[in-house]
C-alpha cells in the first residue's frame, strides 16, 4: 500500500505542476495538498474514522481536477472521475472504497452540508474540513494574499473589509446570489474567516478556532495601523 500511495503522490505532483493549472497553482499546489492530507489524517484519527489510508488517498487527489477544467467550480466533479479511474487502474482499493473517494472529491467544493449525524464523520466531511483548515491561520492568510494579489488591499473607508463579521451562512447566500465574495484582499480574508462556520467535526473546529481568531486580530491591527497613518497624514 505504501507503494500505491507513492504512485498517487507522484501523479498529483506531476499534474498540479502542469502549466495548464495556471494561476490556481499559486494557492493549490502540492504543498496545499500535503497540508490538507496532514489535516485530514489528524481529523480522521481523532474522530475514529476507520481507514486512514483511504483518507490519505482522497486528500492527495482532491484537487487533481484543477488541471482539466476552465471553470474552477467544476474541478470537484471532474477530479472525482479522474481519481476514480486512476484508483481502479492502480487496484489498491475495493470499488466501494473508490466510490467513497469519488464522492468526497466531488463534494469537497460544493455548498456547505448540513451537520452530520452523530458518530464518526464520513470521508466527505473529513476532506471538506481539512481543506477548509488550510484557509485559516497564517498559512491561510498567505494563500489568500497570494491568490488575490491583483485586488486592492482594502476599502479606503473600512480597512478591515466590507465583509467583516460575515457569517458562513451569509457567505453562502452571497455566493448563491452570484455576488462577489471578495473585491479586496481584506475581504478575501473575511471570506476565509467565514468558512470556519462551515466546519463540521469537533476536531476541526477546535483546531480552527485559534487560527481564525488570529486572522481577526490581524485585520484589526491592519486597520489600526492604516488609520493611525491616515490621521498623521502619512497615507
Which residues does each PLM region occupy?
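Divalent metal-dependent phosphate-bond-processing catalytic cores, especially two-metal-ion Mg2+/Mn2+ enzymes
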Residues: 22-48, 61, 112-235
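A short structural micro-motif
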Residues: 63-64, 107-111
Amino acid at each position: 500500500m505504501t507503494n500505491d500511495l507513492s504512485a498517487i503522490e507522484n501523479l498529483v505532483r506531476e499534474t498540479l505542476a502542469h502549466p495548464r493549472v495556471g494561476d490556481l497553482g499559486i494557492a493549490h499546489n502540492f504543498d496545499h495538498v500535503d497540508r490538507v492530507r496532514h489535516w485530514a489524517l489528524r481529523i480522521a484519527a481523532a474522530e475514529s474514522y476507520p481507514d486512514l489510508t483511504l483518507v490519505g488517498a482522497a486528500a492527495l487527489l482532491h484537487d487533481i481536477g484543477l488541471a482539466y477544467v476552465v471553470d474552477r467550480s467544476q474541478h470537484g466533479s471532474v477530479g472525482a472521475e479522474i481519481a476514480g479511474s486512476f484508483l481502479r487502474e492502480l487496484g489498491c482499493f475495493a470499488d466501494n472504497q473508490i466510490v467513497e473517494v469519488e464522492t468526497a472529491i466531488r463534494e469537497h467544493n460544493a455548498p456547505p452540508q448540513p451537520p452530520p449525524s452523530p458518530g464518526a464523520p464520513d470521508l466527505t466531511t473529513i476532506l471538506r474540513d481539512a481543506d477548509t483548515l488550510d484557509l485559516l491561520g497564517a498559512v491561510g492568510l498567505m494563500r489568500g494574499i497570494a491568490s488575490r494579489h491583483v485586488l486592492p488591499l482594502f476599502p479606503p473607508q473600512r480597512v478591515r473589509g466590507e465583509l467583516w463579521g460575515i457569517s458562513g451562512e451569509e457567505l453562502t447566500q452571497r455566493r448563491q446570489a452570484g455576488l462577489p465574495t471578495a473585491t479586496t484582499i481584506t475581504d478575501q480574508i473575511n471570506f476565509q474567516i467565514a468558512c470556519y462556520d462551515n466546519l463540521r467535526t469537533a476536531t476541526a473546529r477546535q483546531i480552527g478556532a485559534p487560527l481564525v481568531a488570529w486572522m481577526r486580530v490581524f485585520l484589526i491591527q491592519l486597520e489600526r495601523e492604516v488609520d493611525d497613518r491616515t490621521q498623521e497624514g502619512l497615507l
